[in-house]
Amino acid sequence: MNWQTKDELLALLTSLVQYESITGSKGEVALAEYLYFILKDKPYFQKHPDDVTLHPMDDGRSFLTALVKKKNVKKTVLLLSHFDVVDIEDYGEFKHMACKPAELLSSFLEKKELLPERVRRDAESGDWLFGRGTMDMKAGLCIQLSMLERAMNGHFEGNLLLITVPDEEVNSRGMIEAVPALKEMEKKHDITLTACLNAEPMFEKFPGDQQQYFYTGSIGKVLAGFFCKGIETHVGEPFSGLNANLMVSEINRLLELNADYCEKVDGEVTPPPVNLMQKDLKEAYSVQTPHTAVTLFNVLSMKRSASELHQMLLKTAEQAAEEIMSNVRKKTQDFQQFEPFQPIERDVTVLTFDELVSRAKKRAGISETERALNYAFANRGELGDRDFSTKIVSELASLCKEDAPLIVLFYSPPLYPAVSSKDDQLIRNTADQIKHYAAERYGIALREVQYFPGLSDLSYLQLEKQEVDAYTSNMPLFNRGYSLPSGKNQALYVPVLNVGPAGKDPHKWTERLYMPYSFEVLPDLLSFTISALLKQSESAGQLLREK
């Protein structure tokens, strides 16, 4: 199988999409093995069998690397992708065809009345490939495999190292475990990672956006949790306690879509915080009011530091604490017209997770606190990272009953530090060349965007120079189930760039790839980009990195 023409690329992509590689599934494991075997079948890797490798991960999954190296050449472009996809439940009656592009399109055309108007037009045009993973991001992987094949045939004046990972859609464990391996490969093969070229798809800024983009960085994300411990009471005596659901609702009111958290950098703006999870922690119905609840928010960043954002979130928690008691006092006064009574005066305490650990040790003792933590970790069961983080906070808060009511600010995996190579000289020069080439060759006005908005594994390629202690010191699972590469022996600093395919509706049942651009323009554009990165002096990007 060759991977150069439009038909060949379509066949390759279809073969990748047909693997239901949903994060955490058997299909995710199987696709890594399939990629390994189709690469091993190439004459180049038959001659260099040790240069294509499946790297087993701690959880039984694997990531794959494939190196095509020129003799006595160090400069290497890293091609990054992920091969997992989100689930297919949203396809509904089309679920069984979600990973079969041809069958899915036929079914869509048979039931056009079920399609939104712009989706129907695209389906009828014949220019769009539908199916889970067609856009995000198996098309990008497909084109990168095509570039690797060109490298096998001596097309580039330098080395290509392809790495494709699982779990990008959930916790990015694949990339987190891959970073130390990349560091080791640099030493083993005597190569220098000059730049990383990701191929995540370009995202529409609004429905119907016709502009085409490439990215010189990737947006940052933290998952901020607020654990609320109220005071339980019977529903017949509501003023004797404090409902934890009331507490989280106030945090939600203050934080959801709060434009104060939006960050503007060079005309780009982060979306405001949005809630991703909210629930009380009662396990069964009763007439006891909920006394523990949690709410988790997706908060995005660009240049804002971890410590600055942490302080903003802490301030919001403190504001919520004041508003909660102000609200309760007002409603208490409203009720006193019916039944005069002396209300219980109390304030809501606000702690960070790190402070909660110290408070628990003070209240219950160091040994009891450690025992509670060890027991929780030993009996995690099937809890995911979000729920287990909440459980750890809850266990520690239970040792601090006298401090209730309280709000605890903590962080849960995954953490995506923002990265930008806009000012790296190598990336700056290459970006300018890409725009000029696209305009001259194809009449396309490619627009440069500093931060890829969809979150990506590029976040883990500049950890050597990133400070995230404000998050990790308040993350219950950090270094106990979730970690980030750190130190000079593990962390990397690599300039980044994202040039990817065009499509619409990622993570929706109408996900689709625009084939004319992705199969006819992108391969040439990506080839040009790789050549531009390799042809420039190795020192061009090195000077800034050493400062």
From Swiss-Prot:
Signal peptide (from-to): none
Which Pfam families does the entry mention? Peptidase_M20
* Molecular function as annotated in GO: hydrolase activity
Gene3D superfamilies the record matches: Zn peptidases
- Tell me the CDD domains matching this sequence: M20_ArgE_RocB
The residue stretches assigned to a coiled coil in this entry are: none
> Member of which family?
To B.subtilis RocB.
Q: What is this protein called?
A: Uncharacterized protein YqjN
What is the native source organism of this protein?
A: Bacillus subtilis (strain 168)
